[in-house]
Amino acid sequence: MNEISIAISHTPWIEERVASFQRLLGQLGPCEVMSFQDRMPNWAWSFLMWHWAAMEAPVNVTHCLFLQDDVEVAPDFWAQLRQMIAQVPYEIIGLESCHPAAPKIASEGIGWYTTIDGLVGPGYVFPRQLLADFIGWRKRELMPGAAVRISEDTLIGVYAMARGRKIYHPVPTIIDHDTSIKSSYLNDEHKHRRTLATWRTHDRSTLDCDASNAVHLGRFYESNHWLCRQYVYDWAPQRHWTCELDRCPEQYAEGL
């Protein structure tokens, strides 16, 4: 069985996030959680969190779950998460499935979509070995200053594009982002801040959850491949234009 470590980024100096953090712990149930709550720049706390999960978590851990303190999780979170990991054990799972096409995909009876860069920070899963590769890539294959300038979730999207990987997103998803709590990064007006298809709106058990049938939606963001060109060593022109052309199919692009 896959063993899962849990890391939660928490900002205890914001009162409403103290309450939401306690709510999340209650929803997760009895489990060992490592929280990262030192007041430091985005790039610094995220590196400490990733390093702990890849290098310091118990040796039997195979997958690393990352959550923010302002999310809620489904009542059957653990059972569903294990099923998802079993479907794509070697892939990154972006649990914040906030693509505008998510409700349409659910209405078509499909339980997954993929992007090449669409990871959003409130919740995601890394296979542990892949996380170690990501950390090495961050150290060796980025130009100086890149890790400081690029936010942690965008950096994972850049990594996925650089490695030619897809990110898998479940529909509906099993987390919900509580946007009644103000963003600690002033992202309150971000148009893709909230998941559009969760367990509250759709029943995943009625959908085709075979990940091999996932709908591929290509690039989620307009310019992440240009970040690759700017900051990734040996970013090949052919790879750049492959990403440029990997656009969301027209029938799923409304609202992007």
Predicted features, each with a name:
Residues M1-L67, V71-L256:
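Peripheral/terminal regions associated with large enzymatic or DNA-binding modules
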